[in-house]
From Swiss-Prot:
Cofactor(s) recorded in Swiss-Prot or TrEMBL: Fe(2+)
Binding locations of 2-oxoglutarate: 338
Cofactor note: Binds 1 Fe(2+) ion per subunit.
Gene Ontology molecular-function annotations: dioxygenase activity; metal ion binding
Record key words, sorted: Iron, Metal-binding, Oxidoreductase
Residues given in the record as Fe cation binding sites: 271, 273, 327
Family to which the UniProt record says this protein belongs: Belongs to the iron/ascorbate-dependent oxidoreductase family.
The keyword Lyase is assigned to this record: no
Protein name in the entry: 1-aminocyclopropane-1-carboxylate oxidase homolog 5
Taxonomy of the source species: Eukaryota, Viridiplantae, Streptophyta, Embryophyta, Tracheophyta
Broad EC category: oxidoreductase
EC number: 1.14.-.-
Amino acid sequence: MGHDSFCYLIVLRCALRCGIIALMQICALQKKERRSKMESSDRSSQAKAFDETKTGVKGLVASGIKEIPAMFHTPPDTLTSLKQTAPPSQQLTIPTVDLKGGSMDLISRRSVVEKIGDAAERWGFFQVVNHGISVEVMERMKEGIRRFHEQDPEVKKRFYSRDHTRDVLYYSNIDLHTCNKAANWRDTLACYMAPDPPKLQDLPAVCGEIMMEYSKQLMTLGEFLFELLSEALGLNPNHLKDMGCAKSHIMFGQYYPPCPQPDLTLGISKHTDFSFITILLQDNIGGLQVIHDQCWVDVSPVPGALVINIGDLLQLISNDKFISAEHRVIANGSSEPRISMPCFVSTFMKPNPRIYGPIKELLSEQNPAKYRDLTITEFSNTFRSQTISHPALHHFRI
């Protein structure tokens, strides 16, 4: 055999080998695509059957299940990140600020403003005590949410809906049918409360009165917090209020039933909030975690405290001075349900036509605008979109 023929055979053999490898890769890819389509179809069927019960995750637990449905299974890489928490030696915890000094003399108020500003810049999260809402009101609010979710399912079903334009609705996983990601282990009561609150008779009977009372007190607290946050930005105390940041809020009553396999799912997946700020009332079970220095840090319940976190819209108008930190809730592995009530202070549900962008007084040659101007409608449409793979705020960066 001549040298040329030998070389030809070698080249032919290599080509055949490459062809076989390529064919194997194509077959593997096609198999993966078929499996993905089957899994997607299975998930859709599961989601449809789950949704039609109108009893949420609470209904699954009440049925006595020992294993969670596959549609709740969180991807392995996300589950691995559950272990990426701060080591005990660091003893990281979000700041706690006593608001009592904020309404006293100038020196005390300045100290409170500095603490809030530092927490908003470094953490995006902090807890507040002496905030003006009594423990009695907070306990009644938590009990009201518990009673709603644990009442007769036939009564709850009257509020069940996926129409987020309604003022009052109950659901489990609002995006259940709009994306293929794993469902979360929780149920939600959502109520639009300000500036045009629903009529008392339109709210659930078991918690309507306390929701109205709690909402009014939250409005007062929210306005006070925006004064302190304005001052922390070096602005007039009324600046953020004059921008309409405090005018609107929606309250969620979150119910996290005990999960038989808490290591396989989440209570809420990693996300940022769409609000200017969020005011959270939580019970003593815990489960909320926030990203800080690339570690997950537990937001441990503090008796009588409320958790405050900066939302995307405040990060935008502060031009990244304050941060909207990613956070999540791990699945409830305790024997009791976890109750929490976030109040999103934002015009997200009923947007106004106002244009929002980085506050001009905060900009300079050294600190140019990092975001383009936008309307709340534009932001909310992006926030709800399932086509983006990163926080909605990134979409508006210049």
